[in-house]
Curated annotation (Swiss-Prot):
TM region(s), chain numbering: 21-41, 66-86, 106-126, 162-182, 207-227, 234-254, 517-537, 565-585, 606-626, 656-676
Protein name per its UniProtKB record: Sodium-dependent phosphate transporter 1-A
Function: Sodium-phosphate symporter which plays a fundamental housekeeping role in phosphate transport.
A Pfam short name: PHO4
Cellular component GO terms held in the UniProt record: membrane
GO molecular function, one term: symporter activity
UniProt KW Transmembrane keyword: yes
Single biological process term from Gene Ontology: phosphate ion transmembrane transport
Topology of this chain in the membrane: Multi-pass membrane protein
Keyword Ribonucleoprotein appears in the UniProt entry: no
Highest rank taxon of the organism: Eukaryota
Amino acid sequence: MESTTAFSAVTSALGTLDVHIMAPYLWMLVLGFVIAFVLAFSVGANDVANSFGTAVGSGVVTLRQACILASIFETVGSVLLGAKVSETIRKGLIDVTMYNSTQELLMAGSISAMFGSAVWQLAASFMKLPISGTHCIVGATIGFSLVAKGQQGVKWIELLRIVLSWFISPLLSGIMSALLFLFVRMFILRKADPVPNGLRALPVFYACTIGINLFSIMFTGAPLLGFDKVPLWGIILISVGCAVLCALIVWFVVCPRMKRKIECEFKSSPSESPLMDKKNQELRCPILKPDPEDLKLPVDGGIVAEVKVPILDMVSVSRTEERTVTFKMGECDDPIEKEKLNSMETNIDQPTNGSVQLPNGNHVQFSQAVSNQMNSSGQYQYHTVHKDSGLYKDLLHKLHLAKMGDCMGDSGDKPLRRNNSYTSYTMAICGMPLDSLRNRDTEARPDEAEKSTVHGADGKKRIRMDSYTSYCNAVADTHMDVEAEEQEEGSVEDVETDRKSSSSSLEERHDQDKPEVSLLFQFLQILTACFGSFAHGGNDVSNAIGPLVALYLVYETGDVTTKAATPIWLLLYGGIGICIGLWVWGRRVIQTMGKDLTPITPSSGFSIELASALTVVIASNVGLPISTTHCKVGSVVSVGWLRSKKAVDWRLFRNIFLAWFVTVPISGLISAGIMALFKYAILKV
């Protein structure tokens, strides 16, 4: 009785159906709805990363915020734009007229296509590989058609277009993204003060974003919005008009507010920390701004030492101030040495103007180069500089200009393996020797040399006094002769690898967006991501719902060539499935697109989003085969390579490309297997 009631409820929910012809196949319709939801789930878990992966990776939005925005725009886009694209998936890949007398075969084929596509997309999501949902459903559709009707029903030109898109999409989008990012970097990012040029470019960027995305949405010809009745010249006129209006609003309203906000938040307080303080003395320091007073930071059970290091800049200014920094010194493990250190005077008040000369002849100048780093007991002391302080950022800039790659000492000196990229910066601050020293009489490995205490032949000790190793360690030890170096070839390889890692890290940090630049591009990237999500919902919901639409309309009308419109509630059903997949499993591919493939900043993320959207619009109108997923991956890789040649994970990119290559055959084989089961075991036709 209960099963009969459930059957009646499902039948009534599906509407008025032609039960006289297709009633025996109602089970196929119900099964199709279940598999279609799983397919929509897999699309949400994989393809939605195209829209918000870069925004999450650049830190503009959190993963939770991205899921909320994507859920809204994906659902709205699927309802408003999805009907048009579903027609292509339903009729554009195979010749449906061959199924006029065997409608049940077409229904079974739709189920097989959805199953094959869903399985491969879920597998790719598990492996964190972004693939094209369109290519999945195309391969699956071709797979079931080969089993059902052989080669005669397949439109092979579509398969050729897919193969071409593997190369055209990432290459074309990558070139356009690279050109846009080069423009942004040349005229904004590399300027001493990027704000003026950034504000001037802001109206242009907003206008391009609005114009391109609006044209893309209107050109799809969504019948629900009436866009199918608007001529091409009307679409162009509306898009250009909205873009110009947006540019005027941004120039007269947004830019003045943005300028005031930047001046208030960044210009008046440039990246300082409570470690900095000022004294009104005559100095040259136009970059750093003073703080009210010294701040001592206690370390539990340890020693707090205050080392005041006034900083000099290379450019003289009329109004100058002395800047000092308080260095925290952690606890010494040796009780005897701790007692000695407690009695030491570590407050340095008298600056002695000095500088550190690099091997290439450049100077990094400070008003206090602490020369007496080794005390009377033969100990080197370790000082921690907070990485968020203005002092650290100023020093980072100076050392970059002085080519830190040359700071590792002369050819006869062997540098130690450094724990992280902050070591050299702290060494320069404290005036410690830039050529790392080692013990003459020991053949300890670099890892052993970095232990807390090392006894040398001359009785000197090296004590680690830094309890914050995540920031920086100033390393020093006794000299090591050349013969010992030749005996430790493995150590030399480790040092060379670490030196390259340090220079790569320095290059990456230098290429990070300044706070004011990030503020300029943040909302732009969110805007492009929302537009992309809206268009993605309209395009990729068809990958999940297209076969279901064919299945439903064949069951309802009994005609495989029906011209009935796609029901809105079917599109909404697919949109809900996409959103659930995003919330449950979308973070995996979002991490690949936004973080694992290459680091992304707001400026590079905006370049990726806008250029890939422009590529899709141009290629679609010209008739070139294109894939949104491939465009985004190509843009991410090209911009990441421009920012830092070592920042791209080429092994991951290789895996992604291999996944693209096997998408069509794997989804096709799975679909063909399910179709063979239907044809020969269940339907027996």
